[in-house]
Amino acid sequence: MPEGTCYKLSPSELTFLYNSCKHCFVLKVRHGISQPSIPLPGIFSTIANLQKDYFADKRTEDFLPELPSGKVEYGEKRIKSDVISFSDFPATCYIQGRFDVVLSLDDGTWLVGDFKTGRSAPEKTEMYGRQLHAYAYSLENNAGDFLSLGPVTRLGLIYYTPADCDMNENIFNLKGGLEWNEVPLDMENFQGFLKDVLTLLEGPLPNPSEDCNWCNFRALTQNVEGASKGLPEIPTCPDCGGAMAKRNGKNGSFWGCRAYPKCYGTLNI
């Protein structure tokens, strides 16, 4: 790997893809090879959007008293961190994504939250915590003109669990309660996790996971007569000689240097 590679990390990939399959995670982040996308049922997006509209500017005591005193300040905004580096490690990274909700607390600090639909799952707190820490880090260490907030002192998940329904004047109502699951804030541990991620990305490609459906699919198709073997060839950057990743732009797909934004080399596909 060329020295100085700068990886783009999304909060969702650090949470779900990293947790489910290291092989697919490295393929995505290092090589730009994504798992085939499967659209989520639209109802979840509808519920999330309705929640964000309803909670906008509301005081916490008016909808979930377990929350610290404050009000909903921001809903769904894009974030991007400054470049993250470690003194004893050549590779760097940055975080880019979109948070669900941020609350301004009465003590002058900020709370970063995420809406979930379904029963609360305390056993997944650590996994979801990566996503929330990624948002918090990016807000406190923003790049350029992206949103800057701090200090972030609280993180957590707001669960909506449907439990009952009724009909009133031809309007069908789905009812349920809200539950607050706080995530312990530990930015030092999160930065250590990011260094582990960079170590993984700079190392050899992990073996396919036995419990990953996409890894199993690739293995099965490679056994079909006439199937091509191995990963597609990754070109080298015409400007710096480093590896490239497949990216999507307004005019379609192209090869972009993985050292971006330090290098702007591109190739047509």
Question: What residue ranges belong to the model's regions?
Answer:
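Metal-dependent nuclease catalytic cores that hydrolyze phosphodiester bonds in DNA/RNA
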Residues: 1-105, 109, 119
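Short cysteine-rich clusters marking metal-coordination/redox-active sites
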Residues: 212, 237-240, 257
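Acidic/negatively charged segments and metal-coordination signatures
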Residues: 232-233, 237-245
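Short metal-binding segments enriched for Cys and/or His
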Residues: 261-269
